[in-house]
Every structure is written in structure tokens, then in C-alpha cells.
């Protein structure tokens, strides 16, 4: 054949090398492989000559097209294997011949030959494993070609897209599906492949995967998942396989296979093949979720899954309903997706589901789809899948918004139509809602409640209830229900807020959702669904501003509100709620559990802010209870003839007392007594029946108080019980109000008519008036006796690693903070009126707003400190006097930046320890009028000998401030004298450590007593120049030559019932001229010339007499003289013997003289 020889001679070398790889035709061989040696040389050839790669791939492309046309399956197999070898040999050069690879694969796929299609899968998997995603994203034509190939493979796996002529039997169908799913698995196994095309690939393959997973059985997905995990566990380890000898011949017995399957019939084999095919589809879904773990891909995957579920439900007419089993096919599929999804991205599934929900209009013909989506969301929320990062409030508001849209009149007419302006949506009773809408509303309420299955942060339940309650609005045109309009009654804000609830149905649904939240949050759940952290209890402040719902025109709203409130009282209150929560006790309660350690400025500010927040919560609680009892008063008078309403009010009042104790009784008792007085002035057509109902409500409440506080054995309790029995015997008592409370459900379901009473006997009812004072006194005694049992006294809060002041509190002081304040007793005895209650509510509301809005609070600054909650009477001293009386414990809150309006700062002893933040403060403050005040605790309370040895050692009270006692954050700035610093020396020297923990109980009074013996500090000598100041350009007090500034003073002791300095053996007692610095101040020790007010005064005595006085200073001196003269006569005072500790302070601490 000379022409063939010439043709072979003229061929390029790369074609010759390719052709040599094809073996000779062998008849009967199922799998043809390329010649190994020729293939190896071809791979070496192209790897060393990159320019030959396009030529080799182009030649393979032509060769494959001819072989496919001629149905030469063996040559096609060799071509595909050559391509796989080329990709693995030069993976970096794949973009050079990637288009040819896809062209060859596409040519093979369009042949519709199952054998060639199956042979192409290995090459396609190799291509997907090594492809360059940058090229796939950059070249649009290449990306379209890649997508077309995957579309063809997906069509093989989709039964509807298979060619009719190729579908002959079930085994053949399963074979085509397996081929398509294997190719899909290869495509999704590459993480970059899913992220390259913006989600187009997911839109192609996910519906095919889910189509092969669906068979209509509810538990099918769960069983598939179990088999998948079992198969993964049983996969043998290739490294541990036995190595066979070269001469060993495998027999039929050693071949792999399933003997049990071999013994079955053809139908069982087909079922096994179909199950394997569905397992392959589940593995594809696993790869999609694991590799497509970006947030955008998870969002798209969720939407595609939900769209498939909705489409299947529409085609099969099998939507989910309230009667559907929770473990159905749709919920199992979405749970598998959520479990396989990365933990940090699971919350996106719920967000995507909410987006799908809002794309479904709330119309009658689309309610089934909305129900399915909400059902799946609810299943996810209550499942064991923990979605960390879920925005609970966003999901809650979304569900509430859809609920509001569902009950609005526009939803019944369509979204494009506008509701009639003449309609009053606030007064619908829900009877016009279809059954589908009612079922959907029930599901929405259940879904909102299931949001609390997992607790993701402490205040989650509190925030959820607050978000719902603040969006419940009164209907348009409704008159205000009380003189106090809550903040949420703003009509313009309500119209702009789509989640506002105006209609009756919306309010009822929201209140029932609150009930579900409380039930789920308090239910006992298994550990698998437990939250990541414990939650905080829901306080009564959450209900502030909702009292008007008790007066709503629609009874459904009133009943739902009372039901939710009763569940809150039952589930969220404990014994601690029986203890009084009042502003007068807030300071003591906060101080009792605070550690007095050396805290930083940030910690002090945080403690102050927490104190203000707790005060605001207490104000909100009392405000709500006051207005709630006011509303109960109005409802009782308006519905005095309706027995059901009176029974509900009695149940509510009794539950408040039983669960809140004195906190509810302080507002309920005056209101009930006022209601008793108004009973005689009722002007109704059924006045006598109203008197019976009101009288039963009043004495029923009094009996509840009597039983709650254990007063049934006292005279007042016996009087109440006797009156109740007398009224029962005369038939002037409401029988439903008994000694045991009814359930709310029984009251609502009771449809019996009102019983007739002996109205002629109403004049013989005895009012409870004479025993009120004794009744209140017994309540006070019972509270004072029982509260310590609920709240046993504990030791002061300790923090390991930080010094603790004291370790003991006198029992008397501990009990004083637990006693019922006199203001509460007076409140229960004072006459009650609506106007006074409204004024008190407005006043407390304004105070709460000022506490929340002010940075430092608005409470007045007191001239005393509370030590661990022992408390003391409110000081009436002036700011300057109170400042002197606290002896270094300033009540100013330390600010992070200097104030422009403050006066020059206090001084600090030169030798006291200086901290880094004080040095930073010196460098940051330039102007003298912007100096930052030093910590009030740097001042010396009283020095000790131990502090002389090492002045840099910290005192145990060096972090101690009045801001931690009071928390009001006020700031007292001392007056200056012609630009000079104040001369009281407050906070100038190092405090001494506490000598004995037993004296800590007297800390507050001891501070005030010791402050009276501290003389003012004189100005520094004129000759000393301090550039820049130290710190803050402040003056320093110099130690006297006779006694160092850190020498110890006398211990404090109790003298004649008052605190003072312990007298020595020769009866030397405290005098106002005696100071901590020794006799030098008393005898007028001479000091160098100093300048006062810019004038040189020369050498003078260093004592009180030589200091220039002002009117304010004279007032302070008079106060001190009055305090000292009342404790000890001046004639007993003798000067202290001079000490020989001169100069020791100069070498024991500090950082030396400035400048630095």
C-alpha cells in the first residue's frame, strides 16, 4: 500500500504517537486500554513540548468524532483514557486543551450510547478534579460549554428527560440514572466548581438529586441516611488489605458479591439497584452541602429545596397540615440539609425560608404553600439542630409581620386591592376568617413559641416578649383606655410599622404566641435540644404599658391578655419575687452583692450603669402594677353586673398577690378599699347585684391577703372570714369566688347564667374599715418575719484574687435592709384615688426616663456611703460639708475624659503610689481648668505603721468609691479660694489597710467620725516649682519634721455610743485640733514661707488658725465643732508626744520629685 505508507510518512510526529497508543482490534474484549509504553512516551512528549498540547488535543477530538460516528467503542475508550492520562500528567496546562476535552465528552454523550456514556464518566471526573476555576469564571463560552455537559448528564438522571427509545426496562433506567448521578457527584465534589458560576450549576443538579430522593414515603430519607452512614463505617481500609501473591489465583468464592442478594429473585435485585441509586443521590446531596458551604450557596440550596417541596406538594396535592406527621418526607429532607450544613451557617436556612415565605402572598389560593413553609420553619426551630447565630428577633418580627398581613382585610381581597377606609379593623372578631387562615394562625403562634426551644443568649425570651408587646396597638379611633397613654399608642408610628397589630385577631394571636413562648421556654426539654446557655427570667417590667389591654372592647383580647399574664405569673415568678422591689431598697441590694476590690474605672462605670438600669426596672415594675390595678378598678366598676368578668378579676388579683406578694399588695389593698367605698355609690340598673359582685371581689381579695400572709388566725383575718360566711348564709355572695381559686379555662367555659341573689340583704353587708390599720400592721410583721426565710443572709460577695474588705456584717444591719420600708406601710394605709395613681405613674415614668437618658443619673448625691448595704439615714448636709464628713470617700463618678467646667483638681501626696493611668492623665491634660480628678480613694483614711515600710503597697480599700455605694454617678466639686486648691486635703494620702475585719460593720460611721479629725492641708512652699504639675498641676502636702505622713494613728473605737479615736491610758481623747500628722499642727510647727493667694506670708504656724477662712470654711468648722463638742469635752484634750519619724517617707515609696 504505497499511498498508506506515504500518508504515514507525512503525518506529524504527535499524530503518529497518538495513533500508536491504540491497540489492535481484539474481538470479544469488553474493556480496551491504550498501549502502555506508547502512552508513556506520548505523555513525556507533550510534557516537554507544551506547544504540542493543542495539536494533540485537536487530533484526539477529530479521532473521537469519527470513532463515535462509527460506533467503535474500543477506540472511544482509548481516546478517553488518553485524555485522562494527559490531564493527570500536566494538570497545570489543562486550560490549554480543556475545550477539546469538553468537546470530546459532549460528542460521546450525544451518541446516547449507555456504554460510551459510562466510559466518559471517569474522564469527566478527572477533568472536574483538575479544572481551573479562574478560566471557568473568565471565559463565558467555556463556562457555557461546561454547563451544557452537566445539563446532559443531569438529563440522564432525570426520568422525564430521558429519550423514550432508550427506556426499555427498569434496570436500563436505573443504569442511566446511575451514570448521570455519578457525573453529578464528580462535578459537585469540586468546591470551586460550585462557586464559579454563581449558582447556575446548583439550579441544574439539585432538582435532579431531589427527584431521585423522592418516593413519597415519610421515613424514606431517614432510612437512607442510616444506610449511608452504615456503608461509610463498613468501607474497608485499603492500607490494611491483604497482599496477594503473584501466583495466587482468585476463585469464584473469593470474588466480591452479596450472597444474600444472589439468592433472591429479579425483583429483589431491581429494588436493591434502585436503593443504591438513591443512596448515590443522597451522597450527591451531601457533597453539594459540604462543598458548597458558603452563605450564598446555602441560601440558594435552601430555596431550591423548598421550591421542590412546594412543587411536589402542588403536583401531588399533598400539602402539609396540622394533622400531618412531623416526621414526613419534607421535614426529613430539610433536617438532613441543616445537619450537614456547617454549624456557623445553619441560621441561613431559616433566613432563606423566611424569604421564601414572604414571596408567597397571603391569599386564599396560596395558603397551602405558606402553611408548608411555616411548618418546615417550625420543625427546624424545635428540632435538635442548633442554629448558632440565628437572629431570633428578626425571625420573630418576620412571623409577626406575616401574621399581621394574614389577618388584615387586604389579604382577603388580594394584595393589589386596598381595604375600605370605612372598615374598622380593630373590631373584627375573627369570625370572617376562613378555616385555612385560622389553622395558619395557630401554626404561626406555635412557630413563635418554638423559637425558644434553643436559648442563644440570656435575654432572648425577654426580648421576644418585649418585641411582641410593644407592637400590639389599639384600633384606630378607639378612645384611650386610661389617662396614661402608653408610648405605643402613636397612630402615625403604628401605620408606618408593618408589624403593628391593630385588629382583634392580631392581638389575640400575639398574646397567645406569648403564652406559647412561656410554655416552651419553661418546658423540660431533652439535652439534645438544650440551649447553649441558661436564660434570664422574664421580669414584670416587660409588661409595662400593656395594662390597657385589660380594658379592650373585645372580650377575646381581654381573655387572651389575662391568660398570658396568668401563665407568666405561674411560670416566671419564684420566691425572690415575693421580696419587695422598691427604689428605697435598690441601693442596699446592689451594694450587698458588690465586691469592694480595687476595680478599674471601666468596672466602676459598668457598676454604676447596672445600678441605674436596675432602678429603672424597679420603676417600670411599680408603674405597671399601679396602672394595672387602676385598670382593674375601672373594669370592676364598669362590669360590676357581669359575674364572669368579676371572677376573672378576682383570679387575676389573687394570682398577683400569691406570686408577687407585697409588691402587688401595696397597690392592690388601697385600690380594693377604694372600690369598697365606691360600692355604696353605684348607679346601675342592677345596683344591688353590682353591690354583691363588688363586695365579693373586695372581701375575696382581703381573704387572699389574709391567707398569703398567714393572718387567718389574727383578729383582722377572723373578721374577714366571719363576714364572708355571713354573706354566704344570706345569699349576698358570689359563689364562684371561694377560698380556692378556679382555673381560667373553667371560668371561660362556664356558660351558666347569673344566679339570683338576695338583693334585699345588701344593706346588711359590713364593710372592712375599722381593722385596716391592724391588718396592714400584721402584713408588715408577716413580711418582716418571712422574707429572711426566702432570702437567707449570706457573707459579702467575694472575688478570689482580689482583696475583700471585712468578712462580717452585723446581723442587725443585715436585717434592716430586709424590713418593710415605712413608705410601703404608709402607701397601704393612705387613701387611694385615680388621680393620685396617675400622677404617681407619670412621676415615676419621668424619673425612669431621666435615669435612662442621663449619663450620670439624676438621683441626689448624699453625704454618706453605704457599706455592703448596711444603709444609713439620708444626709441633709451641704455638698461641701458632706464632702468633709466622708473623709476622702467622694461621691463623684470618675469620668473617662476631663470635664471642661470642673474646678482645679485635688492634690495627691508626692510619696503615694502612682499608677500608669494617672501618669497618662498627666500627659493628656494640658489646661489647668481641665484637670481630671484623682480617684477619691487615693486619700489616706488613716495611716498604719505597715505602710511606712513600703509605701508602694496597695491598701485593701484603694479601689473603694462612693459610686460603688450609691451608684448615682453625681460629682461634688469643692469650691476654691481665688484660684487656690481646697484646703481640706481630701484624698491626698495613702489609705491604711483595714486592721480588723470585725470593724467593717462600722465602716460607714467610722469614716464620718474619723473625718472630723483631719485638718486642712496647707499650700506648698513658694520656692518649689513643679513644671507640668504632679499630677494635674496639683499641690502636695509636705511631711512634718516631727512625724511622717504615713505614721499610724489610734484605732477607732466606740466611745459613749459614738465612734472616735481610742484614748490612751492617760485618758487623752480626741480634740478637733489634733491631727494625723502629729503635734506639729497643734503647736504651730514652723514651715518655710508659702504663698497664699499670690502673697508671701512668711514663716508662720502650720495650723488651723493660720489658714485663711471663708464663709464656707467657717460653716464647716462650726459643724466639726458641734460634732466634737457633743462627743467629748475639750478640756480633756492634751497634745500628743512628738514622734521621731522625720524624713522616712522620702525614701520609702513613690517615684520621687517631679519633673519626670
Swiss-Prot record:
Biased segments, Polar residues type: 869-894, 1032-1055, 1125-1145
Organism: Emericella nidulans (strain FGSC A4 / ATCC 38163 / CBS 112.46 / NRRL 194 / M139)
Name of the molecule in the record: Protein efr3
Gene Ontology cellular-component annotations: plasma membrane
SUPFAM superfamilies given in the database record: ARM repeat
Any Pfam family matching the protein: EFR3
Family: Belongs to the EFR3 family.
Signal peptide annotation: none
